[in-house]
Curated annotation (Swiss-Prot):
Identified in 2 different SNARE complexes; the first one composed of GOSR1, GOSR2 and STX5 and the second one composed of BET1L, GOSR1 and STX5. This is Synaptobrevin homolog YKT6. InterPro entries: Longin-like_dom_sf (IPR011012), Longin_dom (IPR010908), R-SNARE_YKT6 (IPR045848), V_SNARE_CC (IPR042855). Its main location: cytoplasm. One of its GO terms (biological process) is protein transport. A lipid is attached at C194 (S-palmitoyl cysteine). Gene3D superfamilies: 1.20.5.110, Longin domain. The keyword Protein transport applies. The keyword Protein transport applies. Residues 196-198 form a propeptide. The lineage of its organism: Eukaryota, Metazoa, Chordata, Craniata, Vertebrata. Keywords: Coiled coil, Cytoplasm, Cytoplasmic vesicle, ER-Golgi transport, Golgi apparatus, Lipoprotein, Membrane, Methylation, Palmitate, Phosphoprotein, Prenylation, Protein transport, Transferase, Transport. Vesicular soluble NSF attachment protein receptor (v-SNARE) mediating vesicle docking and fusion to a specific acceptor cellular compartment. Functions in endoplasmic reticulum to Golgi transport; as part of a SNARE complex composed of GOSR1, GOSR2 and STX5. Functions in early/recycling endosome to TGN transport; as part of a SNARE complex composed of BET1L, GOSR1 and STX5. Has a S-palmitoyl transferase activity. The modification Cysteine methyl ester is found at C195.
Length: 198
């Protein structure tokens, strides 16, 4: 999972203006970096230009996903990431950056601004912090921990069963479980298998 670009733009009536951008092109060869960066700027501007105000969208291009958020006040943000990067985290980042940007940069500067004239140093920090969505987004971190716990539980249960042995056989042979518990297990098993087929 990787973020390559984080841009803040202004969607004007005549054209889209790049206000500030941060890039991570370290995974590209040295000679490709400036071209890749220019292409990401071009793509970001094009996506904002073709998006309506008040919309969020994700555009797939080969192995990359471009997430765009254009607010009703014409402020827009674009994240370019690989296709494994979670969309929810990308949109959380865009919302956070645009809220912060609108508080720190005067609205009068948006239509006439440029990366050289706009002072918003936090963008590079956001790009590097959100490289790992688990660390940046608490929900993603919790979900990953739950997934890991599920995997551990499944591995543990499978490792307890001997080769060729099934949990159903163990339940039916069990002397510890009462008749009612065995009936409950069988009913639950049938319901779960019924739902899995649907």
């Amino acid at each position: 999972m990787k973020l390559y670009s984080l841009s803040v733009l202004y969607k004007g009536e005549a054209k889209v203006v790049l206000l500030k951008a941060a890039y991570d092109v370290s995974s590209f060869s040295f000679f490709q970096r400036s071209s890749v960066q220019e292409f990401m700027t071009f793509t970001s501007q094009l996506i904002v230009e073709r998006s309506s105000k008040g919309t969020r969208a994700s555009v797939k291009e080969q192995d990359y996903l471009c997430h765009v958020y254009v607010r009703n006040d014409s402020l827009a943000g674009v994240v370019i990431a690989d296709n494994e990067y979670p969309s929810r985290v990308a949109f959380t980042l865009l919302e956070k950056v645009l809220d912060e940007f609108s508080k720190q940069v005067d609205r009068i500067d948006w239509p006439v601004g440029s990366p050289a004239t706009i002072h918003y140093p936090a963008l590079d920090g956001h790009l590097s912090r959100y490289q790992n969505p688990r660390e940046a987004d608490p929900m993603t971190k919790v979900q990953a921990e739950l997934d890991e716990t599920k995997i551990i539980l499944h591995n543990t249960m499978e490792s307890l069963l001997e080769r060729g042995e099934k949990l159903d056989d163990l339940v039916s042979k069990s002397e510890v479980l009462g008749t009612q518990s065995k009936a409950f297990y069988k009913t639950a098993r049938k319901q779960n298998s019924c739902c899995a087929i649907m």
